[in-house]
Design a protein with these regions (language model features):
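Amphipathic, small/basic residue-rich leader segments at the start of a protein or domain
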Residues: 1-126, 150
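A generic local secondary-structure boundary/capping motif
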Residues: 84, 152, 179-181, 202-205
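Short, glycine-/Ser/Thr-/acidic-enriched flexible segments
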Residues: 92, 99-102, 144-145, 167-171, ...
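Extended, hydrophobic alpha-helical segments in both membrane/secreted and soluble proteins
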Residues: 92-93, 97, 105-106, 110-114, ...
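Active-site catalytic microenvironments for nucleophilic, acid-base chemistry
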Residues: 117-120, 138-141, 217
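Internal maturation/activation junctions in enzymes
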Residues: 131-132, 143-188, 195
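Conserved small/polar residues in nucleotide/adenosyl-binding loops
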Residues: 213-220
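Hydrophobic alpha-helical segments, chiefly the membrane-spanning helices
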Residues: 224-230
């Protein structure tokens, strides 16, 4: 059976000797991220990736996601739900997110390291929390205060999932050809029209809700992100 061994010692070396994270202790989040705490997080992250996530790799290849045409639901491979719940309940989802939004407020480099372990152990599983983190970060970067309060805490907790909708039937990598658009309704809402395909994490049984992102801009070489509850 294929085995995954997280590069824990290499990560510890990089953080302590190359990045020298201790010298940033005056910055928000870094004061709590002592060498002992960093090592403990990396050790536990490795245990989770090696013991819980890695065994899912073969299961994911054998089963894949299963679609139920009667109720239009999607079931992820066996073990995915348990791994996702474990990840969210143990706080791995919110490791690098601000405490005021439900995260642990630790340096992003720790979150990236754990994310690398999870995705390396099983990329099929790692995309779910990975896309959720990406959508939450996009909201924190460009969302309104109302959107941040509504969506981010639920995503950081793992209750809601995130995805990104880019590919359309007529284009994939050439995003300048996208036709989907969002038109303001005048009341703060938007009417979104268009068709998306191949939406990773678009439907699953891991979270209660999916936060959908579309790309509604016309062909002006820019993209807009529209949060939507599915």
């Amino acid at each position: 059976m294929p085995m995954y061994k997280a590069p824990v010692q290499e990560m510890k070396f990089l953080m302590s000797e190359v990045l020298d994270l201790d010298k940033y202790s005056n910055l928000p989040g870094f004061s709590d991220a002592t060498s002992d705490l960093r090592d403990a997080i990396l050790d536990e992250g490795a245990k989770f990736a090696e013991g819980v996530v890695a065994p899912l790799n073969r299961v994911a290849d054998m089963q894949g996601c299963r679609y139920n045409g009667e109720d239009h639901s999607v079931k992820t491979p066996d073990g995915f739900k348990n791994a996702y719940d474990t990840m969210s309940q143990n706080g791995w989802m919110g490791l690098g997110f601000p405490a005021e939004h439900g995260g642990q407020g630790l340096p992003g480099v720790l979150s990236i390291a754990v994310s690398e372990m999870v995705s390396s152990a099983c990329m099929a599983f790692g995309m779910y929390p990975g896309l959720t983190a990406g959508a939450a970060e996009a909201l924190l970067s460009g969302g309104t205060e109302e959107q941040i309060k509504k969506y981010v805490p639920n995503m950081v907790s793992g209750q809601w999932g995130g995805t990104m909708n880019l590919t359309e039937p007529h284009c994939g990598t050439d995003l300048g050809m996208l036709k989907s658009k969002a038109v303001p309704n005048g009341d703060g809402s938007y009417s979104i029209t268009g068709q998306k395909i191949w939406i990773s994490s678009g439907e699953h049984d891991l979270a209660e809700n999916c936060l959908l992102y579309t790309s509604p801009s016309p062909r002006d070489r820019s993209l807009s992100r529209m949060p939507s509850s599915a």
